[in-house]
């Protein structure tokens, strides 16, 4: 999983297609309808959570979904999207001879048309216009479309699209060009952060700002409509609240779609790749749109934000020494935890038993809100979120217990040892001084021979 999931909301696990329900009392669930696309993914953008995936890492042909990257490189390398560009038909005319001409889409852009980069982005993102994508690639790269493709691949590596490789800016069929549902979702999430991208992709109909009146005398009739039928209110595939981002069709790659839907404050991104273009009876079908709609319906019907841990929940207690009164303190979560949750799974099945205390015992005083430890919420053995545990209330210290504790502890303290050593040294010094004083006193008491005494007379010699 990507590093983002080690972040604030570890709610990726509640995406229950990845959870083994055999260890719980839950009945499990499946999508109510079959997903026809070979690869699919549904992400809640609000918490960056994958809530459904099918073959999300299988390599598929992107088709004109490539235009998402074309738009990214254009937006990031064009200082002013209002800059005008004169269209040169020779930049894309060679595509007329491609083997898979039916895969290509055109927007009635002609040679010498003068359009802003903004216009070209609208034409490309709404209709998959190869005139627009080739013109963007040619001009942004300074006249070398292959250089632009290299810029696309460099950006893919920077974003972390590890299973994606681009060979052209149009999405034209090329077996060497591939991607995955996971990479397309990651690319789209990146693109949505860029200026103008969301606005462009969310537009259903657009008219160029600076038409060449010679090529387009009826300016009002020159309009580009988004190819995503989910945005067409008159279509049977209309889906309220959808933002159409991009569709793609390839004869050899099937139908692809990336769509964004918003409802009741929830935002979902759906990706469907390699959907059949025809039914078993040979009828034209739009299973990619049906798959996106089904994924959105499933999410809106069965997922909602639920409080899985209240900040008032008591999750254990710790013993408190020297307490005045209760000799324990209760622990509660520091904050409330709300996660996007599947409504058929009871939140009571979430385990709260994985608690790590900072200390096994506390000493008073303890203040309300003081950090005591952490609890990790788990479902089916997988972590959902980690929350700090704090003290519910104050625990005051008993003066009597504290004084007795200090008195008992003092003989074992380093202060006591230091005091004992210092006292011993001082006593030793005192004894030495006392001995010295006694010796000196005795010396002072011993009689001394007078310096000028009269010599004793020897009477015998005198005679």
Where are the predicted features?
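Bacterial N-terminal signal peptides that target proteins for export
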Residues: 1-9
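Active-site-adjacent loops and short helices of periplasmic peptidoglycan-processing enzymes
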Residues: 20-182, 186-195
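Alpha-helical transmembrane segments forming the membrane-embedded cores
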Residues: 457-463
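Hydrophobic core
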Residues: 10, 14-18
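Domain-terminus/edge residues, biased toward the C-terminal soluble/receptor-binding domains
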Residues: 161-162, 175-178, 182-183, 188-424, ...
């Amino acid at each position: 999983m990507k590093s983002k999931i080690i972040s604030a909301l570890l709610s990726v696990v509640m995406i229950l297609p990845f959870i083994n329900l055999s260890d719980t009392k839950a009945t499990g669930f499946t999508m109510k309808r079959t997903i026809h696309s070979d690869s699919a993914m549904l992400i809640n953008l609000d918490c960056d959570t994958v809530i459904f995936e099918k073959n999300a890492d299988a390599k598929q042909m992107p088709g004109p979904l490539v235009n998402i990257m074309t738009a990214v490189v254009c937006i990031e390398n064009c200082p002013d999207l209002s800059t005008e560009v004169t269209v040169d038909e020779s930049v894309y005319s060679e595509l007329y001879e491609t083997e898979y001409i039916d895969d290509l889409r055109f927007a009635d852009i002609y040679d010498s048309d003068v359009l802003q980069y903004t216009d070209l982005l609208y034409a490309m993102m709404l209709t998959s216009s190869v005139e627009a994508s080739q013109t963007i690639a040619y001009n942004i790269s300074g006249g070398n479309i292959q250089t632009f493709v290299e810029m696309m691949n460099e950006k893919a590596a920077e974003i972390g699209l590890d299973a994606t490789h681009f060979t052209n800016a149009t999405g034209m069929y090329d077996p060497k060009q591939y991607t995955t549902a996971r990479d397309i979702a990651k690319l789209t999430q990146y693109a949505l952060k860029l200026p103008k991208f969301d606005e462009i992709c969310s537009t259903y109909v657009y008219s160029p700002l600076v038409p060449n009146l010679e090529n387009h005398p009826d300016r009002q009739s020159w309009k580009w409509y988004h190819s995503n039928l989910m945005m067409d209110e008159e279509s049977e595939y209309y889906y309220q609240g959808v933002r159409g981002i991009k569709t793609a069709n390839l004869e050899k790659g099937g139908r692809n779609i990336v769509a964004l839907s918003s409802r009741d404050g929830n935002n979902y991104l759906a990706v469907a790749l390699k959907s059949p273009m025809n039914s078993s009876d040979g009828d034209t079908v739009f299973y990619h749109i049906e798959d996106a709609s089904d994924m959105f319906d499933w999410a809106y019907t069965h997922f909602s934000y639920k409080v899985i841990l209240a900040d008032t929940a008591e999750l254990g207690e710790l013993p408190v020494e020297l307490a005045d009164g209760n000799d324990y303190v209760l622990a509660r979560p520091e904050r409330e935890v709300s996660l996007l949750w599947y409504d058929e799974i009871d939140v009571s099945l979430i385990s709260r038993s994985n608690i790590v205390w900072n200390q096994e015992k506390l000493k008073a005083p303890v203040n309300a809100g003081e950090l005591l430890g952490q609890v990790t919420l788990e479902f089916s053995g997988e972590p959902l979120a980690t929350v700090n545990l704090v003290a519910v209330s104050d625990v005051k210290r008993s003066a009597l217990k504290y004084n007795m504790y200090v008195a008992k502890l003092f003989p074992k303290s380093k202060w006591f040892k230091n005091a004992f050593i210092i006292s011993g040294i001082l006593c030793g010094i005192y004894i030495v001084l006392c001995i010295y004083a006694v010796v000196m006193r005795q010396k002072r008491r011993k009689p001394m021979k007078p310096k000028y005494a009269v010599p004793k007379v020897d009477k015998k010699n005198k005679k």
